[in-house]
């Protein structure tokens, strides 16, 4: 090896090392930024309202109920700020929304629950004092201006078959069972769990797990399951046409489907085409695991290591057979 070849090889190794160091540093800064934002948003809750809305020492206000005929292909928009949302199916052609307001020191009547009806569907909103009363699909709801109010609203919904759902809260879990139309479920501090017969699903949280179960994917649109601090899991039918794209920064990846895992150091990715491909299934987290499982499977999916580079496999040589005893 000449001196020039030696210097050239060392120069390439140094450049490669600098690039790798830059990538690792960038990933580290991304983790710090995302986790910091999530923690800051969650810590703000303590200054704006009481997050313990299931505590035993809370007083219950008058229950609220809304019943309305809602045919398939319509949408139910549900907007909450402090409190959970639970949705289950009904074979009746009417949507039922039950709300329970609880509090410690504030007045339950300080939080109004209002509805807005249109040709596209129905919007139900929990409106805290000092907040705009614009209850509609495009209404913007934040926790700003809620200092000192400890009222929480827990929604329980009966959703007719074929009705789309768009449900959001800031502090609380969102749980949807037995949906049969597209679902968009969002929270900031809490878990999001969606089970649907058709899909597609958008399940989003910042601090909590995001889990979507689809028995089929017949509706138009892509699937997005996203969290920052928590696990992201998707359960799929054994036969499905989709392109899967999953990412985690610090967690593990597991799959019961033939998907390829790549990545070194902290970041891992999961990619692959199922069936004929087509619509996208995106699964993303920062500090949690990514799991892809088959619907109905109770076993833990195997954790998949990043796919190593292929090397030639040397041929195997069979040993010569031993002579049998008693033969010449």
Give the ranges of each region predicted by the language model:
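Short, surface-exposed interaction patches in beta-rich subdomains
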Residues: 201-204, 209-328
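Short acidic/polar N-terminal linker immediately downstream of export determinants
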Residues: 2-95, 100-108, 140-156, 260-277, ...
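A generic structural signal for short beta-strands and their flanking turns/coil linkers
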Residues: 93-95, 120, 151-153, 219-221, ...
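Exposed beta-strand and adjacent loop surfaces of beta-rich binding modules
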Residues: 75, 94-96, 110, 164, ...
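A generic structural motif
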Residues: 79, 100-102, 186, 204, ...
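Right-handed parallel beta-helix
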Residues: 62-75, 84-88, 110-194, 232, ...
């Amino acid at each position: 090896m000449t001196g020039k070849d030696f210097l050239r090889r060392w120069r390439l190794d140094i450049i490669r090392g600098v690039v790798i160091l830059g990538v690792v540093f960038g990933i580290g800064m991304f983790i710090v930024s995302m986790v910091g934002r999530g923690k800051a948003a969650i810590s703000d809750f303590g200054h704006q309202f009481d997050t313990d809305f299931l505590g035993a020492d809370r007083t219950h206000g008058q229950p609220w109920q809304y019943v309305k005929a809602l045919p398939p292909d319509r949408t139910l928009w549900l907007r909450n700020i402090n409190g959970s949302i639970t949705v289950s199916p009904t074979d009746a052609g009417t949507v039922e929304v039950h709300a329970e307001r609880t509090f410690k020191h504030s007045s339950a009547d300080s939080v109004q629950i209002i509805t807005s009806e249109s040709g596209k569907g129905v919007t139900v909103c929990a409106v805290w004092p000092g907040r705009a009363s614009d209850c509609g699909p495009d209404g913007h709801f934040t926790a700003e201006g809620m200092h000192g109010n400890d009222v929480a609203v827990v929604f329980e919904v009966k959703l007719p078959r074929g009705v789309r759902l768009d449900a959001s809260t800031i502090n609380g879990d969102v749980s949807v069972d037995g949906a049969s139309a597209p679902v968009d479920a969002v929270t900031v501090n809490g878990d999001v769990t969606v089970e649907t017969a058709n899909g597609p699903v958008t399940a989003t949280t910042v601090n909590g797990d995001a889990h979507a179960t689809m028995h089929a994917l017949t509706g138009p649109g892509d699937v997005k399951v996203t969290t920052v601090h928590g696990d992201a899991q998707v359960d799929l039918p054994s036969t499905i046409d989709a392109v899967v794209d999953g990412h985690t920064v610090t967690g593990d990846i597991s799959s019961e489907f033939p998907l390829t895992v790549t990545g070194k150091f902290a970041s891992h990715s999961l990619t692959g085409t199922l069936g004929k491909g087509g619509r996208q299934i995106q699964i993303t987290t920062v500090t949690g695991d990514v799991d892809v499982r088959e619907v109905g499977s109770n076993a833990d999916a195997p954790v998949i290591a990043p796919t190593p580079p292929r090397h030639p496999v040397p041929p195997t040589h069979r040993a010569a057979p031993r002579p049998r005893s008693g033969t010449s």
